[in-house]
Each structure stands twice: as C-alpha cells, then as structure tokens.
Amino acid sequence: MPRDIPATKGVYLLERVTNKEINLENIDEEMRMEQVRQAGAKLDWASFGQAVRRNLQEKRNTIDADGRIDVLKSLAFMKTKLPIEADAPMEEKIRILAESLGCTHVRTTRGWTITKPEELNVDLTIKNGEVDTVVLSFWEEAAFYSGEATKMLHKGEWSELRDRLASMLAVYNKDLDRNDRKTCKAAMDVLGSMLKTMNADEMYTSIQNNNYGYYLHRSDLRQGRLYYNVEPLYRRVRSKHHTYSLQKEDWDILPFFEFSFVPSDSVHAFPEHNPYGEWKETGSAKAAVCLKLSKGVLVSEPTRRKLHEISARSTTIQCYTNCYRYLTGSVLIKDNLKMITQFPGECTQHHYTIDRSSFTSEGDSVITEIYLKRLQDFHKVIEILRKEAMHISIWESVLADCYELQGLEERVVPAINMFVNLSRDMITVRFMTKYAPIRVCIRDGVWIEAKVEVVNDQTGAKVADRVDELLTRKLNETWSIPIMLTFAVSGEDCALEQMKVPLREENPETKLPTPTKIIVHKN
C-alpha cells in the first residue's frame, strides 16, 4: 500500500563546524538523501525501488559499454606494439607482424605475402626456414627489393621492422578516405619534385640559408626529412673535424620535420601534377598537412601566434613553460638572476643581472607538431622556426659562457656590470661607460638574422652606424651575446667592479642535463 509521507516544507541542515571549516562532504550527502526522500514521497516504495533498480541498470550498461570500448582500443593499440620474438616460429612472427600492421597474410609458393589494400604489400621469400629477401610496395607504387628490411630480418629485428613500416604508413592517416588520400599523395609527389629542383646542397651553410632547407629524400624504411637549421656553434664544432657538409651521423642530431597528412573538418586546396611544372592548387581534400618535428621545439607565445595564422588547427603542445627559465635548468630564481662569464685568463668578465620579470610568464611552450592549411606554407614555418632558434640560442649563449664548473677556485675578478631584459620582441643589455650609459638592443632582422642597435640609454641617440654594423655582423656569425659584447666594450671603457667567483657555492644546474649548447661549449 502506498505510504503517506508528509511533504517537507524546508530542509534544515545542522552541521557541527570543527576547526572553523565546513564539512562539504556531509552537506552534499545530506542534500542527496533529501532528494531521495522527496522522490520517495511521490511514489509508493515498491515503485520507488523499481525506479532505483532501473536507473542503476542503465548506469551499469553505460559503464560496461564504455569499458568495452576502452578495452578494445587498448587491445588494438597493444597489438601494434607487441614484441615479435626472434626465436618464435616463422608462422607466428608473420602473423604478429601482419596483425600489428592491420594487414592480412597468406602463404605463397615462395614464402609469405602481407597485404593492406592500397597501402602496403610485403613479399617475403623464405629459404631454409629463414627470410631470404623482402620486397616492398607502398601505396600501390612499384614494388622494390629492400636490402635494409632484409638485413633487419637477418638480424632478427622483427619488431624494429614493424615500427619502421608503421612509421611509413603514418604519412597518410588511416582515417583519410580514398579520394583524399590520392589527392594528398599527388601533392606530396609535387612537393618532392619541387624540392628535388630547389634543394640546397649538403653544405651546412647552404642548409641554413636556403629558403627550403635541405630535403633528405625518402629511403626504403624512412620518410623524407627536411632539415632547416644548422646553428653557428654546431658548424664550428664540426669544422674542427674538417666536416662542412651533412653526414649520416648528423641525420638524427640536426633539427628536421617530416610531412604527413591528417583528416580535417575543413576542405583545403592541394597542388596537383601540372604539365608545365607549375605549382597550382587545383586539388582539394578534407585534410591538413602535419609537420612532425624531430624533437620538441621551444617557442615563445608570440611565435606560436604566428604559426597559428597559417595553421589548420592548434599546434601540438608538449608542455607550457617560460622559454628563458626553461633553459636555466634547476637554478632557483627568487630575485633577479645574476651570472658572470668564464672568459679565460685575466680577461675582463661580464657580470649579468637578468630582470626577474623575464622569467615569470608561462605562455611559452614546447611544440611537437604543426598543422598547415596549405602545403606551400612550409617555407614560412622554416623562416619562423629559424628566427626562433636564433633568439633562443642567443639567450643560451649567456648561460653557456656563464656556466660555472664544480670545484672552481675562489678568486676575485674584474667585471663590467650589465643589466639584461629578455622579451621576444627585443633583448636589451644596459651598462655604464666612462662616456655615457649605453643600451644595446637586439631584434629580429628582415632576413633570418638579428639586428643590433647601440644607443645612449638616456637620450636614445644612436652611437654610430659602424658600431651597429660591426655588432650585427658579429652576433649573426656567433649567435652569442658575450662574444658580441667583447667587441662593444672593454675594461678600459668602464668602471670595473671586483667580483668574487664562483657566484654559487654549488651548481644545481649540474644535477640535471644541461642545455645542448652548454654541453658543446664544455667540449
């Protein structure tokens, strides 16, 4: 029988407050129970019980369905990463290799064939129970014998081969439909032809100065790579070994990006083959161009905004940070950061005081992928990344020349006080000379270079054009503020301060890997 429950006019929650804090969990629980009581007042208890069971059943089914989807996704991902044991039976290795690539496999008179329609075909010739030859075909292209793949299987590197094949297939995302994939592949062929014509030679300086960098064309099991930046310091280090052009040992060290294509909500224009060899965007596809960076690239917030202007969607961000603080390692910055150069001998040192405000913003980031609307805009990305690399490297040069090794002998050195302010628009260095207060301003130039301007800090008047030209040339040759400033000022021009070094009793930056430039500098 229905139970008569009087309607409740109001809810009064009495909570004993301890330690002057409100127990929100108890309040939430009491409110939920009151909702149950009010719902029970409208139903007999039998109907109420049925409603509760029905509600719980719906939730359980929903949770189970979501759980099943997650499990299926996890299993699918695990299949792509399952290790292939070298000592497993041949049929087992073939099966795992095929399933992890989403392919079918069939036995042939000569061995095995692994196939994924329109994407991959692998023919394995078996002799005496071992793989004798590997013939590959990607995206319905002409088949070719792959010596690299054959050597890998002779060494038992089945898992490594699977990963390399998966990387090749990732150029065209599996979610692209057939027509869009064909359009993207045609665009990639046009790009490859253009880069073959416009490619720089393998000299480090040519790679740095060419609008399109240097394109290392695709190999059997490696995507094409576009190298876009070779810093002056790297060139100097390699020149000590009489190396001035790109070598195989440079391939995984120098920064590069790879091209791939991913689905997009919007339709974008793509180039197609033209009998006159012209770049004309006559094709279209619901796809975007992905530039996958070889490693995370540190960029400032203004630079990320520039990339956004030509992007189909937001860049892939690994983490947010402050780009200047990011490079200092674990040095604790409570106030203005103070550093002193480690010039050899009796040289006058530079004592830098970097304004603390330079390290407070958290809008900078480390990015790993850039998505373009138009394929031809990749050269704009090259220009943006080169300028950003130069800006970051200029700040890193201060860290490198001020790096204090553990166990330095305590001593007193003469130093020039310099005050530094860091921002993406301009780096300023201020110091007092016997003649006037000086401000050195460093900005991006028109081309991929920095521009230096030296002015009177009080009046803003330029010191001399020839000084600007000299310092601009030195900075672009070295990407180093300390080296550049040695041409701007000497101990005879300034009132020197006697500084006790090292500045820190211990160097926390040695506890973690130091920036690449510092490592190279130490060698």
Curated annotation (Swiss-Prot):
In terms of superkingdom, the source organism counts as Eukaryota
Q: Which GO terms describe its cellular component?
A: nucleus
Subcellular location as annotated:
Nucleus
Assembly and binders: Component of the Mediator complex.
Task: Quote the protein name from its UniProt record.
Answer: Mediator of RNA polymerase II transcription subunit 1.2
Q: Does the keyword Nuclease apply?
A: no
| The encoding gene | mdt-1.2
The answer to keyword RNA-binding applying to this record is no
Q: Which family does it belong to?
A: Belongs to the Mediator complex subunit 1 family.
* Job of this protein: Component of the Mediator complex, a coactivator involved in the regulated transcription of nearly all RNA polymerase II-dependent genes. Mediator functions as a bridge to convey information from gene-specific regulatory proteins to the basal RNA polymerase II transcription machinery. Mediator is recruited to promoters by direct interactions with regulatory proteins and serves as a scaffold for the assembly of a functional preinitiation complex with RNA polymerase II and the general transcription factors.
Q: Which organism is it from?
A: Caenorhabditis briggsae
Q: Which UniProt keywords apply?
A: Activator, Nucleus, Transcription, Transcription regulation
